[in-house]
From Swiss-Prot:
First-tier enzyme category under EC: lyase
Pathway: Amino-acid biosynthesis; L-lysine biosynthesis via DAP pathway; (S)-tetrahydrodipicolinate from L-aspartate: step 3/4
Chain residues that bind pyruvate: T45, I203
Catalytic activity: L-aspartate 4-semialdehyde + pyruvate = (2S,4S)-4-hydroxy-2,3,4,5-tetrahydrodipicolinate + H2O + H(+)
Cytoplasm found in the keyword field: yes
Organism: Shewanella sp. (strain MR-4)
Name recorded for this polypeptide: 4-hydroxy-tetrahydrodipicolinate synthase
Family designation: Belongs to the DapA family.
Subunit field text: Homotetramer; dimer of dimers.
Function: Catalyzes the condensation of (S)-aspartate-beta-semialdehyde [(S)-ASA] and pyruvate to 4-hydroxy-tetrahydrodipicolinate (HTPA).
One MF annotation (Gene Ontology) recorded for this entry: 4-hydroxy-tetrahydrodipicolinate synthase activity
Entry-linked Gene3D superfamilies: Aldolase class I (3.20.20.70)
């Protein structure tokens, strides 16, 4: 099972909006070098909403190729049409991903019954492990622990990314879903507590730019060392907040560019590059987190 420090990887782009595969390869090498436990390719932070399906699959496939078996790659396979999610899932099943991460269908606001039917249909289209993804702040639907529990019996649904920031759900999910069901935090600000309460890992935005420290925090929390985890986590807390001064992944792409991790901080419309009033805030947070800016 995949656990620990997982990066929700950005998708680097050139100034013309095309994917910058050279920078993508460098990012994969960077995370392998820094000890990151796994990569999520083309999730929310990877701009899945603005990559058409063929490009989406290509980026995931190239990430798998660059990883070359040295780090697991989880491919984003969410869509708000079940038929589209199934088509994407079938394509990703051919490129070597270790698992897939499927966000709840967004905008059309399915009922709990609809969520269960959606995820069962997607899971039935592949043998690859599936991770559910609950982020109501983006999707306008909240998949409650009771709904997640209805999917535990599906053999290749292995866990959930819970991004509400409500750490009380860790206990409830564990009670309903059992000890073998993987629980991943999707909220950096509450990730430490999530792990200390029994979570298995974190799918993180901040991990793009502080992977070594974030890995150390996760390892300490998973080992039950609350004091060490807190000492690592506290200097990063300003960063967790400031990386959401505008919609993710606008700030983290800007930060990665300032660090020299990617050649360009370009982001696809309708998102636009980081506004100037956020520059100083983010630079201050990066300084406090001991990030070197080029």
């Amino acid at each position: 099972m995949i656990n620990g420090s997982i990066v929700a990887l950005i998708t680097p782009m050139n100034s013309d909006g095309s994917v910058d595969f050279a920078s993508l390869e460098r990012l994969v090498e960077f995370h392998i070098d820094q000890g990151t436990d796994a990569i999520v390719a083309v999730g929310t932070t990877g701009e899945s909403a603005t990559l058409p399906m063929n490009e989406h699959v290509t980026v995931v496939a190239q990430t798998v190729k660059f990883a070359a078996g040295r780090i697991p790659v989880i491919g984003g396979n969410g869509a708000n049409a079940t038929s589209e999610a199934i088509e994407l899932t079938k394509s990703l099943s051919k490129v070597g991903v270790a698992a897939m991460l499927g966000v709840t269908p967004y905008y059309n606001k399915p009922t709990p019954k609809g969520l269960v039917a959606h995820y069962k249909a997607v899971a039935a289209s592949t043998d690859i492990p599936q991770i559910l993804y609950n982020v109501p702040g983006r999707t306008a639907v909240d998949m409650k622990p009771e709904t997640v529990a209805e999917l535990v019996g599906v053999s290749n649904i292995i866990g959930v990314k819970e991004a509400t920031g409500d750490v009380s759900r860790v206990k409830r999910l564990r009670e309903l879903c059992g000890n073998d069901f993987m629980l991943y935090s999707g909220d950096d600000a509450t990730a430490r507590e999530f792990l200390l309460l029994g979570g298995n890992g974190v799918i993180s935005v901040a991990n793009n730019i502080v992977p070594k420290a974030f890995k150390a925090m996760c390892d300490a929390a998973l080992a039950g060392n609350a004091e060490l985890a807190a000492s690592i986590d506290e200097p990063l807390r300003g960063l967790y907040t400031t990386l959401f001064c505008e919609a993710n992944p606008i700030p983290v792409k800007w930060a990665a560019h300032r660090m020299g991790l990617i050649e360009c901080g370009h982001i696809r419309l309708p998102l636009t590059e980081l506004s100037e009033q956020c520059h100083g805030l983010l630079l201050d947070a990066m300084t406090r987190a001991q990030i070197e800016v080029k």
